[in-house]
UniProtKB/Swiss-Prot annotation:
Belongs to the L/F-transferase family. HAMAP family: Leu_Phe_trans. It comes from the Bacteria. The lineage of its organism: Bacteria, Pseudomonadati, Pseudomonadota, Gammaproteobacteria, Chromatiales. Its EC number is 2.3.2.6. GO terms for cellular component: cytoplasm. It comes from Nitrosococcus oceani (strain ATCC 19707 / BCRC 17464 / JCM 30415 / NCIMB 11848 / C-107). This is Leucyl/phenylalanyl-tRNA--protein transferase.
C-alpha cells in the first residue's frame, strides 16, 4: 500500500520527500501537514511541490506527474482574444493590488462553488508578496478590478496559482501580458501545476515530472528580480 509523508511542523530542514515518491492516485499527493511559513513554501516551490487543500482539511502537498507548463514564447492567442487586445479597452498592471487579486480568486464562483484559497492561504501568500516573492497581474476597466492572476517567482521560474475574471477574457488578457513580460525577462517557463483545458487552449502543455524538475533545478537558482514588478512601458503601449 502506498503511503504519503507526514510533515513535522517543528522541522524545516529536509521536510519534503523527493517528488518521485508522490502517489499515482490521487495524482501527485506527496505529503500532509506542516505549515505555510514563507520558509516552507519557498522550500516546497524549489522542489516542485505546492500546497493545495480545501477548508477543513490538513495542508496537502502535491507534485503531479505529468506537470502542466507553458513556454511563454509558445503562448497561443485566439483570433477573438487578439481582437480584444487590439481594442485596448482594459488596463493591465503588475503588483498594484495583490490583496485584491487573491481575494477575488478566493471568492465563490458564479456556479456557487467555493475555492481552495482559504484565509490561511491568503495570509501566507500576502506575506510572500510583501517579501517580493509572490506577484499579481491586474486587469482594470476604468478603476474597477475585473480580472487578474497571482503566482510565485523563484529565480526565473513563475508558478501560477489562480486567476479570476469578471469580464470576458479579463484573466486571459492579464496572462498574455505576463507571458510577454516574462519572456523579456528570460523566464523559460510558467508552471501551471495541474491540467486545465482553459490554460491548454492558451498553449499550456504537459511535461513528465522529471523533465519539469530538470527545468526547475536549472532556473530556480537564477538571480531573482527586484521588487515590485512593473511592465516595460513599451510593452503596454504596443499591441500584442
Amino acid at each position: 500500500m502506498e503511503e504519503f509523508h507526514c510533515i513535522d511542523s517543528n522541522r524545516l530542514a529536509n521536510a519534503f520527500p523527493h517528488p518521485r515518491l508522490a502517489l499515482a492516485e490521487p495524482n501527485g499527493l506527496l505529503a500532509v501537514g506542516g505549515d505555510l511559513s514563507p520558509e516552507r513554501l519557498i522550500m516546497a516551490y524549489r522542489q516542485g511541490i505546492f500546497p493545495w487543500y480545501n477548508q477543513g482539511q490538513p495542508i496537502l502537498w502535491w507534485s503531479p506527474d505529468p506537470r502542466l507548463i507553458l513556454f511563454p514564447q509558445q503562448l497561443h492567442i485566439s483570433r477573438s482574444l487578439h481582437k480584444r487586445l487590439r481594442r485596448g479597452i482594459y488596463q493591465v498592471t503588475l503588483d498594484l493590488d495583490f490583496p485584491g487579486v487573491i481575494q477575488a480568486c478566493a471568492s465563490p464562483r458564479q456556479d456557487g462553488e467555493g475555492t481552495w484559497i482559504t484565509s490561511e492561504m491568503k495570509s501566507a501568500y500576502n506575506r510572500l508578496h510583501e517579501m517580493g516573492i509572490a506577484h499579481s497581474v491586474e486587469t482594470w476597466e476604468d478603476k474597477e478590478l475585473i480580472g487578474g492572476l497571482y503566482g510565485v517567482s523563484i529565480g526565473r521560474i513563475f508558478f501560477g496559482e489562480s486567476m479570476f475574471s469578471k469580464r470576458p477574457d479579463a484573466s486571459k488578457i492579464a496572462f498574455v501580458y505576463l507571458c510577454r513580460q516574462l519572456q523579456r525577462w528570460g523566464f523559460p517557463l510558467i508552471d501551471c501545476q495541474i491540467q486545465s483545458e482553459h490554460l491548454q487552449r492558451l498553449g499550456a502543455q504537459t511535461l513528465p515530472r522529471n523533465k519539469f524538475l530538470h527545468w526547475l533545478h536549472e532556473f530556480s537558482n537564477s538571480p531573482s528580480l527586484k521588487r515590485p514588478w512593473h511592465f516595460d512601458p513599451d510593452l503596454l503601449k504596443n499591441s500584442l
